[in-house]
Amino acid sequence: MRDKVTGARRWVVKIGSALLTADGRGLDRNAMAVWVEQMVALHCAGIELVLVSSGAVAAGMSRLGWVSRPSAMHELQAAASVGQMGLVQAWESSFALHGLQTAQVLLTHDDLSDRKRYLNARSTLRTLVELGVVPVINENDTVVTDEIRFGDNDTLAALVANLVEADLLVILTDRDGMFDADPRNNPDAQLIYEARADDPQLDAVAGGSAGALGRGGMQTKLRAARLAARSGGHTVIVGGRIERVLDRLRAGERLGTLLTPDRSRKAARKQWLAGHLQMRGTLVLDDGAVKAVSQDHKSLLPVGVKAVQGSFRRGEMVVCVDQGGREVARGLVNYSALEAQKILGQPTDAIEALLGYVDGPELVHRDNLVLV
């Protein structure tokens, strides 16, 4: 199964607070440099990389001289504000030594639950990755309240993995992986090398609370792996202090715990598209577009659309029908109903002239289409 790791071409790497701050002693720039060197090696090997970095609150606590994590919301937000500055600067300077650009991206769960903002975030991240820039993502703790109190960056990392359709989510933690018993209390505890993410037996061994610096314990990492698995992604939970951990994972070494999905990414995404969104409108296709979509498995271009019905926004679900009204497919549109009306029947190179901008050459991308 480790071929799922060695063959992964798009990685999301999440690094926790305890690792980044040397268990609360401030940002561990030496450790960050070691991880950066390994991530640069991934980049040079042609692997697309997104980094989800915890540590803003913990770094802020260190800068402010606070020994214990505060419970008051305004103090947590203040610590996040102070810490985020140093955190981003540290990543930027470390990657710059190797000639790589970074980009700060602050997200909330709301950004990924609103479909329009979800698509905007996805477009931005894809563009950054295509440009060879390493996005450094953190939750926007400064302005979000519930996420500080209840959220965790393990969940955010899984959402980001789904957002960018990553092949692999790597969660670096202060433990070597998931064990069949708590290794702190049981010296005979054995590392679980591989398991299905949805295996109910994992719940019994994922107990335990989060550390004093962060918000996510092993239970949140298991939930994150299950969230990634819903879209067909694989997750490795592994010790961040293991020497050359990312290099060795890429080489196929059995480090940490590999949690696998029960179906392929394509099948998982298609199932989600088919069953989890309400239809907001209808696109009537000409015969050529019907063939392109249903037989050739191509994207739906504006030139093949004869009519637009209903009211929908970018990112919402529409039904695609032939001229006889038979449903052919359904998918997520790149343009609103009003915009679609303006570009229907037109070639792709006319979109910018008609709208003044281009959100994509397709009305519905083939990755966002499911045949019915």
Curated annotation (Swiss-Prot):
Disulfide-linked positions: none
Annotated binding of ATP, by residue: 14, 173-174
InterPro entries listed in its UniProt record: AceGlu_kinase-like_sf (IPR036393), Asp/Glu/Uridylate_kinase (IPR001048), G5K_ProB (IPR041739), Glu/AcGlu_kinase (IPR001057), Glu_5kinase (IPR011529), Glu_5kinase/COase_Synthase (IPR005715), Glutamate_5-kinase_CS (IPR019797), PUA (IPR002478)
EC number: 2.7.2.11
Domain PUA: 280-358
Pathway per the UniProt entry: Amino-acid biosynthesis; L-proline biosynthesis; L-glutamate 5-semialdehyde from L-glutamate: step 1/2
Keywords recorded for this protein, A-Z: Amino-acid biosynthesis, ATP-binding, Cytoplasm, Kinase, Nucleotide-binding, Proline biosynthesis, Transferase
Binding site residues for substrate: 54, 141, 153
Principal location class: cytoplasm
GO BP terms: L-proline biosynthetic process; proline biosynthetic process
GO cellular component, one term: cytosol
Annotated compartments: Cytoplasm
Reaction it catalyzes: L-glutamate + ATP = L-glutamyl 5-phosphate + ADP
Domain of life of the organism encoding this protein: Bacteria
GO molecular function: ATP binding; glutamate 5-kinase activity; RNA binding
Function of the molecule: Catalyzes the transfer of a phosphate group to glutamate to form L-glutamate 5-phosphate.
Family named by the database record: Belongs to the glutamate 5-kinase family.
Name this polypeptide is given: Glutamate 5-kinase
Source organism per UniProt: Pseudomonas aeruginosa (strain ATCC 15692 / DSM 22644 / CIP 104116 / JCM 14847 / LMG 12228 / 1C / PRS 101 / PAO1)
